[in-house]
Amino acid sequence: MKSLNQLHLCKALSVFLFTLSVNSQVTTIDRSMQEQTMLSVLYAQSSTEYVANCIQTYSGASLILDEAIADKEWTASLEQSGDYSSKAMAIILDVDETVLDNVRFQARAILSGLSYPNGWIEWGLEASAEPVPGVSSFLENASNKGIKIFYVTNRVAELEDATRENIKRLGLPFDDDRDVLLMRDENGWGSDKVSRRALVAKDYRILMLVGDQLTDFISLEEAATDIDSRRKLAEKYSDMWGKKWFMLTNPMYGKWEGAIYGNKYPDTKEEMMKMRLDALKP
């Protein structure tokens, strides 16, 4: 009888341990790929150097404003054409990591083991992003000088209301007399921002462009190339940087990563890891 009870006990213990093991496997979060971005996210979230770089970028842009206003031949847009000297003035900014700081979303992705686009829409709908350091004073300065502020973003149109709410909640300039928030998927617009910049250029002289990706300044076609060619693009437009174009540092994501994979993201983590390692130059 004692042996039988011991047998039942052993069986019950085995079932319990198996169940515990299965549950553990189910709830274990695979963060292996997300953790590769951890240092870049921590840099953006906790380093003084990142904050200083953002403030430096926007302070530099503010110092150029009066010169840009005075020079009627001044334009920052490659899409600008014809006689624009008498047009009203505008500045175009990207939104994410340029105006709105989404580093908390990136932190969530690491902790949850999920990767973009999982959770992105939900984050956007919260409308709780904080401003990128330096942007508030820059935009206040520009707005006070009579410059129209346009936000050109590749957030999907579903997030338009929440994005507007977020920007207004931060007290940033946001005019309601015309559409100043130009979303992807709105009016048939795709990811390339050329057509949206051209739309603004019809009525405004564009003084500056501000963003964190090459495509905030040039066409998607020109920017979607290999690593070496992208580096040459920085040199090609060397007379624009820090004068008419202002780039924010974003080590967390962007087309720069796509260039590592030949602009075609691999299907497996193993292949992605290999391509990342192959891109390193010791």
Please describe what each predicted stretch is:
Residues T28-R31, S59, E160-P282:
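C-terminal cap/substrate-recognition subdomain and adjoining C-terminal extension
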Residues I69-S81, I149-N154, D176-D179:
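Surface-exposed patches in mature extracellular/periplasmic domains of secreted proteins
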Residues Y43-A52, I121-S128, F150-V156, E186:
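Second-shell loop/turn segments in exported
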Residues M1-T28:
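Bacterial Sec-dependent N-terminal signal peptides
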Residues E97, V135-K168, L214:
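Substrate-recognition element of Asp-dependent hydrolases with the DxDx(T/V) motif
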Residues A90-D94, L100-N102, K148-T153, V180-L182, ...:
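Structural recognition of the beta-strand scaffold that forms the well-ordered cores
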Residues S24-L93, I260-P282:
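Non-catalytic pre-domain segments flanking phosphatase-related domains
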Residues A88, V99-E130, N144:
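Active-site neighborhood of HAD-like aspartate-dependent phosphohydrolases
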